[in-house]
Design a protein with these regions (language model features):
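Structural signature of alpha-helical solenoid repeat scaffolds
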Residues: 99-100, 136-139, 174-175, 212, ...
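Short sequence/structural elements of tandem HEAT/ARM alpha-solenoid repeats
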Residues: 73-74, 107-115, 145-152, 182-191, ...
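Eukaryotic acidic, Ser/Thr-rich intrinsically disordered low-complexity regions
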Residues: 71-75, 204, 209-213, 217-253
Length: 253
């Protein structure tokens, strides 16, 4: 059993890790989720949900029923509009704010989803990068599994003509895996594909290093042995000993 975190009750370690990965530190945050959405988190079981339900009840709170109006507030709406602003300062402010907001689960993900997907092919590479990173963050707010349909579109941005855009998207894409076991498998499969195919690309060694870091981050968040095994397997594909050793350092920390 883990120690209490914030005002959360004691839970088994897998359930506690699930909450931590989703950025949930306080009971009040659970009022934005339905029980079904909570169960989507990898490591969360019905016993833990029952414990959390009782803890909420003791404070006069409850999980979201799924029937409430889920429309985003005006501030979020304005920020989403501003990521397409031609004013770089306004655009960056919106980006920073939305990235911070989506560190935790949010209930407006599906209201923003389609416009973020459209943003992946926007003429402004900054918009493409922002939308790519936000979609990565929204992986934990996707109980309906929309990402399974759209993941290839997100992965495509990791090959963007602007390498800085591609890299920012790649470095954040592992967070899609925080949506549950199937989401983890989706991410690992996509990263494996990129690791192998980037051999023909100019920045192959940087891409492979970033992929190694992504897999380590996902492993740290989930402690899934399959992720570590796949990462080490991919590192063995590198022919250059210098870079093979560099990728391996990610797993020695």
């Amino acid at each position: 059993m883990s120690k209490e975190q914030g005002n959360l009750p004691k839970l088994a370690a897998p359930a506690q890790r699930a909450l931590t990965s989703a950025g949930i530190m306080q009971l009040e945050q659970l009022t934005k989720l339905t029980e079904a959405e909570l169960l989507q988190l990898h490591g969360m079981g019905r016993n833990a949900v029952g414990t959390l339900r009782e803890a909420l009840k003791s404070r006069g709170l409850s999980f979201r029923t799924g029937m409430e109006n889920r429309k985003m507030d005006k501030t979020i709406r304005t920020q989403l509009d501003n990521i397409r602003s031609e004013d770089a300062q306004l655009q960056n402010k919106a980006y920073m704010s939305l990235m911070k907001e989506t560190e935790k689960s949010v209930d407006w993900a599906y209201e923003a989803w389609d416009e973020l997907i459209e943003g992946l092919t926007h003429k402004d590479n900054h918009v493409r990068a922002i939308c790519g990173q936000l979609l990565g963050n929204l992986g934990k707010s996707d109980p309906k599994g929309r990402m399974f349909k759209d993941f290839d579109k997100l992965l495509a941005v990791t090959k963007d003509e602007k390498f800085v855009t591609a890299r920012h998207t790649l470095q954040n894409i592992w967070k899609v895996g925080l949506g549950g076991k199937k989401s983890q498998e989706l991410v690992v499969k996509g990263l494996e594909k990129r690791f192998k195919e980037c051999i023909k690309e100019k920045n192959c060694t940087l891409i492979r290093y970033d992929i190694s870091v992504c897999l380590r981050n996902l492993y740290d968040a989930t402690t899934s042995s399959e992720i570590k095994e796949k990462a080490l397997e991919l590192i063995e594909l590198e022919k250059d000993v210098k870079y093979k050793n560099k990728y391996a350092t990610v797993w020695k920390k």
